[in-house]
């Protein structure tokens, strides 16, 4: 009986040590990620980054995204809902991480549409039609054009603007910043400089709510 009790005590002790170690490792990873983001704050937002929302909003969500990413497509309306529920209090900043093959061409389309002040309508049309132009995890940019009809875009001008060197530089800078911040998948979110502790809508929502609460103190 005594040996059985000792065994149970030892087992419980090992379990507690494991839980404590797991929590410590998780907290340490979160702290390291937050410290990295703080040290590399300049890499989070660039002057060229597309933004939505009031410039002085107390909460800034930075999203590294790929237009060919299915999860990015799913998260976009959810982030818009957060913004609608908190008017003028949240600003969204988009950064390009075209990890899918061919996605850089779709990013170039977005930047070309931006030159005609049609970035957000083009983005929403592109995301809505994503199942049509992403095939086998590869972006088929030529299939995107038909989904841009009706937006009032000069498509011929877009085709010419897509090859502009500054667009290539924007993509290169965003990818470089993604490497600096250790962004390896999309979407990747930072809220007021803090990365998500783990990926998920609930985690993003919690971090946003915390930032909103802090801004009211």
Regions found by a protein language model. Name each.
Residues 27-42:
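Ser/Thr/Pro/Gly-rich low-complexity linker/stalk segments immediately outside membranes or between
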Residues 46-50, 78-80, 175-177:
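A generic local structural motif
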Residues 1-23, 146-217:
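C-terminal cap of thioredoxin/glutaredoxin-like
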Residues 50-52, 133, 196:
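Short clusters of hydrophobic/aromatic residues that line enzyme substrate/ligand-binding pockets
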Residues 42-59, 84:
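A short beta-strand-turn-helix
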Residues 57, 62-68, 73-149, 179-184, ...:
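Structural alpha/beta surface segment adjacent to cysteine/selenocysteine redox centers
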Residues 43-44, 74, 170:
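Short secondary-structure boundary/capping elements
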Residues 54, 63, 198:
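Conserved strand-loop elements at the edges of beta-sheets that form or border functional pockets
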């Amino acid at each position: 009986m005594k040996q059985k009790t000792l065994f149970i005590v030892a087992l419980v002790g090992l379990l507690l040590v494991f839980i404590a170690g797991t929590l410590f490792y998780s907290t340490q990873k979160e702290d390291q990620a937050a410290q990295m983001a703080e040290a590399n704050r300049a890499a989070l937002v660039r002057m060229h980054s597309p933004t939505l929302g009031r410039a002085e909003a107390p909460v800034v969500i930075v999203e590294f995204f790929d237009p060919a990413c299915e999860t990015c497509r799913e998260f976009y309306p959810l982030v818009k809902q957060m913004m609608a529920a908190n008017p003028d209090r949240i600003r969204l900043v988009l950064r390009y991480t075209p990890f899918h093959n061919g996605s850089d061409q779709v990013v170039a389309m977005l930047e070309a549409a931006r030159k005609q002040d049609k970035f957000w309508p083009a983005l929403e049309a592109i995301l809505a039609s994503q199942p049509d132009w992403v095939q086998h995890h590869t972006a088929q940019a030529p299939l995107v054009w038909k989904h841009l009809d009706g937006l009032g875009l000069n498509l011929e001008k877009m085709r010419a603007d897509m090859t502009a060197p500054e667009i290539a530089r924007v993509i290169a800078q965003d990818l470089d910043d993604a490497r600096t911040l250790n962004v390896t998948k999309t979407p990747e979110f930072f809220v007021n400089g803090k990365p998500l502790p783990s990926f998920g809508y609930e985690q993003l929502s919690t971090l946003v709510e915390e930032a909103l609460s802090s801004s009211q103190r």
